């Protein structure tokens, strides 16, 4: 499964959906500031693989680590999944703010306060606070979430410009 956020049907964790709907029992979540076009152009990047099972992290690290891609491991599966969901939401809000031409100061407020709230939510869900200041949180938000071509950023702009509602899962 290659996805981020929460399951659109249930609002639950995607890793739980994989476990429920497949024979897989040892799952992980990958996140980080990795734009597909930059990865394909072999530009340097880093990501984190989180799993409750060390071997999932080890296998993923061995498969993806290269001279241009640094792969870190974590056991904070819920933190990485929560950070991924929050980055999606914050990207949408940043797109809305940019469409309203509110400026970089407001973007700074959205990023800093959004990450603070994401961390609080994560702690309530048994995540580790440092995950949100790492690759899966601030790293992903800076590189991907605030990128004009990010789908959720574009959704946020569309909500303001076109007045249409967009489902963000």
Q: What does each model-identified segment do?
A:
Residues 1-2, 28-31, 48-51, 93, ...:
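Short beta-strand segments
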Residues 1-44, 60-62:
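Rossmann-like NAD(P)(H) cofactor-binding subdomain of soluble oxidoreductases
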Residues 6-8, 79-81, 143:
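Short, small-residue-enriched loops and turns at beta-alpha junctions
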Residues 12-13, 115-116, 153:
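A generic alpha-helix surface/boundary motif
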Residues 17, 21-25, 44-131:
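Internal alpha-helical scaffold of NAD(P)-dependent oxidoreductase catalytic cores
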Residues 31-33, 75, 147:
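Residues at the C-termini of beta-strands that transition into short coil/loop
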Residues 38-40, 83, 147:
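Short glycine-biased active-site loop of nucleotidyltransferases that positions the nucleotide triphosphate
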Residues 87, 91-98, 123-169:
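NAD(P)-dependent Rossmann-like dehydrogenase/reductase catalytic/cofactor-binding core
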